[in-house]
Amino acid sequence: MEEMITREQMEKLKKLLLYAGAEPEDFARCQMDVQIANRRRLTAFLGTACAFFVALTLGSCMVPLLYDHIPVFAVALIVGLGLLAVEQMLPQKLGLFLNWEIYAFGAMVYALGIYLGTVQTPDQRATAFFAFLLCVPMLFMMRPILHIANVLLFDGIFLVCVTRFKDWRVIPMDVCNALVFGAIS
């Protein structure tokens, strides 16, 4: 009896993590619609991000306090433009490459938050990363296990960077925030 309950619980967990609670057949049937929606979102988010990075780069040129951020925003702009160009060249039905491009976009956003929150501002709290940690999983439809893996990966990278680059007075608060916001995400 106990083995049966455990097996049922494992099946429910597998169904939840791999198929978002749906039946595998239903999940497979809606994948084309999910990819079309993700592609539209990726195009919109990349275009918005590029416009935002242009504004940040130009704005940083005008504010002496932000001069150090110019290369970071310029690199993010170049990466965003590159991803946008690749996305526009993809055939409509190439799902696997689209997924990799979604991961690359998420990685770029997380990396920007980690870099700005740890290396660029070692004596301040890393608020940008926590905002990205909460928002990025909501941008695209993916299997829940992939969202969880991404959050754990980048939260772990952030924690390593915090202990490596941050001022000792800020480390406890950033570690606590990373654990709380990582769990929420």
Language model features with spans:
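Non-catalytic regulatory/interaction regions at protein termini and inter-domain linkers
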Residues: M1-A37, F129
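N-terminal membrane topogenic signal
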Residues: V34-L46
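Hydrophobic transmembrane alpha-helices and their membrane-interface boundaries in multi-pass
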Residues: A44-V136, F154-I157
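Transmembrane helix interruption/hinge and helix-loop junction motifs
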Residues: P64-L65, Q120-P122, M141-L146, F165-R169
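Transmembrane alpha-helices of multi-pass eukaryotic membrane proteins
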Residues: H69-F73, N99, P144-A149, A178
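Hydrophobic alpha-helical membrane segments of integral membrane proteins
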Residues: T127-F129, M141, I145-F154, R169-M173
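Perimembrane helix-loop-helix junctions
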Residues: C161-V162
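Juxtamembrane or sensor-core-proximal signal-transducing alpha helices
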Residues: V175-S185
